[in-house]
């Protein structure tokens, strides 16, 4: 993997800097590194493809070295270099795509394609290593089963989940009380509702709670907490739990009271925030517990009192809600990130070449299914294909 990254870094620099008119002295070190790459690769044969609809391609390396010049690089010099660069870039692109289409239940962190395995040979160690990539660093750590640390701006750690629970219900579904929520990616929205606006509740207060276990622990998280759940702020028709009927939800939004957010790790409370909105920080957690209340307004104007009568029918439904967004966090596991295209790149390549479903990844790289059942085998394979995708992104946009 280090060889693949070093080749890509050298090629990227060469493509950007070996241009007509450049002083040779400004790129002499790069050209020496480029020539070392050619010397190491010459005489080697590789094969890529052959899985799904990806064509088999054979690669042969027999290129001349770039020479020295006293002055600027001329058009002939650059054209000669470009021919070599383009072949190497095409090779790297195909090696990366070949690697992204393969998976293994055992040793999924190790190279799976023939071409990348061959590059693990001792002779390729002569290529100048550049391990400055976070992904290369973490691939090395994961490969040695050491502690890794991944920084994601918006970690897609929450499997998609959208449902409701009813704490009070009737066959007619005309006086309901409960919670509904949607969890996805890095955002949680939860709403508590009561058709009677807590009229018969103790002290006219309804208590709601929503607990969200994460698939992996997060640390040093920056989080936004808002006293609203906009996805549950408009009328809708909802299928009943048994699927035999539908019921009507017509929310009128109130501000939640006594809001408390707890961040837990292995069942122990690490951070707690009460009635605090905006930006909050969570140090270390694998579970989020949200609790809040719906309080019937003690004083109401006639217009508001008409919204919340003391007896049925209840046309409008009192609703309170919260939105919690994980803006950034550190995670020791491999996760798709809203600010990166790695998952999209891997998925698109696998779709383009109609890669058959293997033993590790779900059909279509369905992220909800993948993160819901996030096994060590899946994590190893994700680490490898995301590393390769990050390498490919240096050369192929």
Swiss-Prot record:
Predominant location: virion
GO molecular function, one term: structural molecule activity
UniProt keyword Zinc, yes or no: yes
Subcellular location: Virion
Location of region: Interaction with the inner capsid protein VP2: 62-73
Disulfide bond positions: none
PTM field: The N-terminus is blocked.
Keywords tagged on the record: Calcium, Capsid protein, Intermediate capsid protein, Metal-binding, Ubl conjugation, Virion, Zinc
UniProt-listed Gene3D superfamilies: 2.60.120.170, Viral capsid alpha domain
One cellular component (GO) term of this entry: viral envelope
A Pfam family this chain is assigned to: Rota_Capsid_VP6
Binding residues annotated for Zn(2+), in chain numbering: 153
HAMAP family, per the entry: Rota_VP6, Rota_VP6_A
Subunit structure: Homotrimer. Interacts with the inner capsid protein VP2. Interacts with the outer capsid glycoprotein VP7. Interacts with the outer capsid protein VP5*.
Family: Belongs to the rotavirus VP6 family.
Additional notes on this entry: The VP6 trimer contains a zinc ion located at the center of the molecule. The zinc ion is not essential for either trimerization or transcription activity of the DLP. Zinc-depleted VP6 has an increased sensitivity to proteases.
Function: Intermediate capsid protein that self assembles to form an icosahedral capsid with a T=13 symmetry, which consists of 230 trimers of VP6, with channels at each of its five-fold vertices. This capsid constitutes the middle concentric layer of the viral mature particle. The innermost VP2 capsid and the intermediate VP6 capsid remain intact following cell entry to protect the dsRNA from degradation and to prevent unfavorable antiviral responses in the host cell during all the replication cycle of the virus.
Designated name of the protein: Intermediate capsid protein VP6
């Amino acid at each position: 993997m280090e060889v693949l990254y070093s080749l890509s870094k050298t090629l990227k620099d060469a493509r950007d800097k070996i241009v007509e008119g450049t002083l040779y002295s400004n790129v002499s070190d790069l050209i020496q590194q480029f020539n070392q790459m050619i010397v190491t690769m010459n005489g080697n044969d590789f094969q890529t493809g052959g899985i799904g609809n990806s064509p088999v391609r054979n690669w042969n390396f027999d290129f001349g070295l770039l020479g020295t010049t006293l002055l600027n690089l001329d058009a002939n010099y650059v054209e000669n270099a470009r021919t070599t660069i383009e072949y190497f870039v095409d090779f790297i692109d195909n090696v990366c795509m070949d690697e992204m289409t393969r998976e293994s239940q055992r040793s999924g962190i190790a190279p799976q394609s023939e071409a990348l395995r061959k590059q693990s040979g001792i002779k390729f160690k002569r290529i100048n290593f550049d391990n400055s990539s976070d992904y290369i660093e973490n691939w090395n750590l994961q490969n040695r089963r050491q502690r890794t640390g991944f920084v994601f701006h918006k970690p897609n750690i929450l499997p998609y989940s959208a449902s409701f629970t009813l704490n009070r219900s009737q066959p007619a579904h005309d006086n309901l009380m409960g919670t509904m929520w949607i969890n996805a990616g890095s955002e949680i929205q939860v709403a508590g509702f009561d058709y009677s606006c807590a009229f018969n509740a103790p002290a006219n207060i309804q208590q709601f709670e929503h607990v969200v276990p994460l698939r992996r622990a997060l640390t040093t998280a920056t989080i936004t907490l808002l006293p609203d759940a906009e996805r549950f702020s408009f009328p809708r028709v909802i299928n009943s739990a048994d699927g035999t009927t539908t019921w009507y939800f017509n929310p009128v939004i109130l501000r939640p009271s006594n809001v408390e957010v707890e961040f837990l790790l292995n069942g122990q409370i690490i951070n707690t925030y009460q009635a605090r909105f905006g930006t909050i920080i969570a140090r270390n957690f694998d579970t989020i517990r949200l609790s809040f209340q719906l309080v019937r307004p003690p004083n109401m104007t006639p217009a508001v009192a008409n919204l919340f009568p003391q007896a049925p029918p209840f046309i409008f439904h009192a609703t309170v809600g919260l939105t919690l967004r994980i803006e950034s966090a550190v995670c020791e596991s491999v996760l798709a990130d809203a600010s990166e295209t790695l998952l999209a790149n891997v998925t698109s390549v696998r779709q383009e070449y109609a890669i058959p479903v293997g033993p590790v990844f779900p059909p279509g790289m369905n992220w909800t299914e993948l993160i819901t059942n996030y096994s060590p085998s899946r994590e190893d394979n994700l680490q490898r294909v995301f590393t390769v995708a990050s390498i490919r992104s240096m050369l192929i946009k």
